[in-house]
UniProtKB/Swiss-Prot annotation:
This is Arabinolytic transcriptional activator araR. Belongs to the xlnR/xlr1 family. araR subfamily. Disruption phenotype: Impairs growth on L-arabinose, but only a small growth reduction on L-arabitol. The lineage of its organism: Eukaryota, Fungi, Dikarya, Ascomycota, Pezizomycotina. One of its GO terms (biological process) is regulation of carbon utilization. It comes from Emericella nidulans (strain FGSC A4 / ATCC 38163 / CBS 112.46 / NRRL 194 / M139). Transcriptional activator of the arabinanolytic system. Involved in the regulation of extracellular arabinanolytic genes and in the regulation of the intracellular activities of L-arabinose catabolic genes in the pentose catabolic pathway (PCP) in response to the presence of L-arabinose. One of its GO terms (molecular function) is DNA binding. InterPro entries: Transcription_factor_dom_fun, XlnR/Xlr1, Zn2-C6_fun-type_DNA-bd_sf, Zn2Cys6_DnaBD. Residues 1-17 have a biased composition (Polar residues).
Amino acid sequence: MASSHQGNGTVPNSQTDAPPDSSTKRRWRRNRIACDSCHARRVRCDRQFPCSRCLRSEITCEFTRERRKRGRIARSKLAEMAKNKMETSETPAPAKTMNGIPAPAGTEIPGHVSPASTFHHRSPPANAPTVSAPSVDGRRSQTDPQLPVRRPEIGGNVTEEWLAGTHVSPGSYEFLNGPAFGEGLGPFPHMFDVWNGVDLAAYSAGTSQGSKATNAPSTSTAPLKYPVLQPLMPFVEATLPRKLVFDLLDLYFTSAFSTHMHPVSFLSKDAPRPSSPALLSSMLWVAALDDRAFSLPISPPQRKRICQFLCALTIRLLRPLIHVSFKDQGGAAAAVAAAAAAATNNPAFAGVGQDLPPTTVHHPFEGGGDDRGLVGPAGSLDDVITYIHVASIISSSEQKAASMRWWHAAFTLARELKLNQEIEVMPNGDSQVEGSSPPFGYSLPGWDGADPGPVFNYSNPTRSSLNCVCDRQDQNTITEEHREERRRTWWLLYIMDRHLALCYNRPLALLDAESEDLLLPLDEASWQSGIIHSNSPKSDGPQCLLSADKNKRRLFPNFICHDHSVFGFFLPLMTITGELIDLNQARNHPMLGMRLNGKDAWNVHVSEVLRQLEIYKASLTTFAATTSDPEAPLSAYAHAQSEHLPAEPSLSQAYAWHTQTVISYASYLVHVLHILLVGKWDPVSLIEDKDFWTSSPAFASTISHALDAADSVDQILRYDPDISFMPYFFGIQLLQGSFLLLLIVERLQKEAGEGILNACEVMIRATESCVVTLNTEYQRNFRQVMRSAVAQARGRPVNHSEIRHRRKAVLALYRWTRKGTGLAL
């Protein structure tokens, strides 16, 4: 047994502990007597009790671990240990001790922890124990005691201390590719392994034999800078320093993902928004992947491990398509471990779950779902937003086809929760109706779960209780902020559905017909300043008694650009894009396409889309004229973000710059929609030209739009050189706007004019900027194709047949034909 050392300067007797001779340089040996704190963080200890790291962190420096021999533990000894554990659990002592150290009052030493649990435990108990750190030989200690709680020194940099540890040992944190996930299983699963269906329980179930859990609380008693993070801290505090978590949350609200949520509610210290741990984890994950995360004091390898940890944690907390709270998972984890022991006959699983009473084994879907136990609870709005975060991250990677399973989950859950309908607030909250958001029933220390909030009724959308609740202060009623958050989430999904349909050549999932009763999103200035009213111009819609005829909301469909936000200028364009997608799907239909081509009904539809584009172009001109003088809109803009904006001259310049950026992007998108309306979407069919479309008047009309689109891209590069304003949406638009220029250069070769070649050069520069900001394979491939075509047109000697064959092979990867899948390889 190891002796305890409470910072009194005594250390275990060992040959490796002797001081080095001053005349000879001592050979460094494996440090087997690191203090508990350094051992837990996997950092080098100077072996001076108290050590320098503990002194800097103001924590107790002690050595209480059992020192045992290296090598595997005999199976007979494992079975004996499990048997002894079962016997001790049957006769619990009033106060347990561990290695001579009495257990803290009010805490309970867990009898046994399921090896099949993941992320500390499958069901975090009320005291949230954490898994003990691996010992020197790579295994977790058999009886690791409670680890000292780190307290950051006043004025010190906790992030620097944490990063110093990870620099010394890349496996400092077992969740960041550390060795604590078992022998023979390799490192922690990569991000795409999780998305491809890897069960995280396998990584935890394969941990070293005889693994235990300590009784150390994973949360500190210090107040949080952002109390909204309280539900998440038990899961991340043992791995990520608080300062880094706070910085990531701040960074999230400067990203493009935060448009559908209210930053003030999340960052409030008095009344933070009740949020699920999965949503909070996904927000940190989004921020960690943002390019601006490099401004944080973390190295790229550390950033990668942080992203992997937050990825797996988000999936673990989200429980996709199940959405079962953790409070019922203790028995379920024991049942899984018992089944694993029976199936594998592994002594390491012996006795798992024996100390749990039979009543703790609940069905995972108990209290929700159908009577056969096949369908789980619906989920909540937070789950939908979490799906959006996960799906967006995958869409921006090379795994684009895999992202659709997450997008479909978001679409389905949003429709199941009826986010496309104005909700009615029921006066009594005794029972929840079907489709409402369940409360967050996570059992975490110091957090009894978020307030289940109001109860919604979707049965009759014409009731008077649809009216604005801006004058109500009752906590049991839904707030206008939450109603607006639901609307913005639905419209964001609406935008993404059109974007994905254009990217992957698939039909629409969210229809215009099911969106027409929902109010359009509030303008950005009112949303950021918290001036929210549900005041519909329609008599059967929500009415605001306080606003009367003021603050009237916009109705769907709307084809007018009215502000700088993605909902203000991009949503009308995506509404028009949806009609183009319907037209293209009908054109490619095996039967309808032949019947409708050239018919009057088809021409009427094309004329209607042209009318909508003209309405948007006129509104864009008005928007540019009204925002050129920043006096009127500037006051509202400054009121919305007065705490985050610079002085007045800088504010005016930033506002004008933002306006020009929006106008440049919107102008380009209008030209691309013109090309998509009368042109061809598939690059191979465009180049082959089997139907002689290049000889038609439609081709001549699209050339001018292609050149004007290149001019708009030149303006975009002036105001947004790195294409960071809307990188997730712009890539496919840039690709479709470049196909026609590629065709012209391919046909004319050296006869192409300088104007055409300059337009191609602009498109190449924009594509290169996209590659830097959001690196994807299709952009790299198209850049090479476009660059070779321009070089050939400028006189580079090449083998024409060979280079044309290579271009066609690359373009054939991305087809928008009847069977094509677009960018989804």
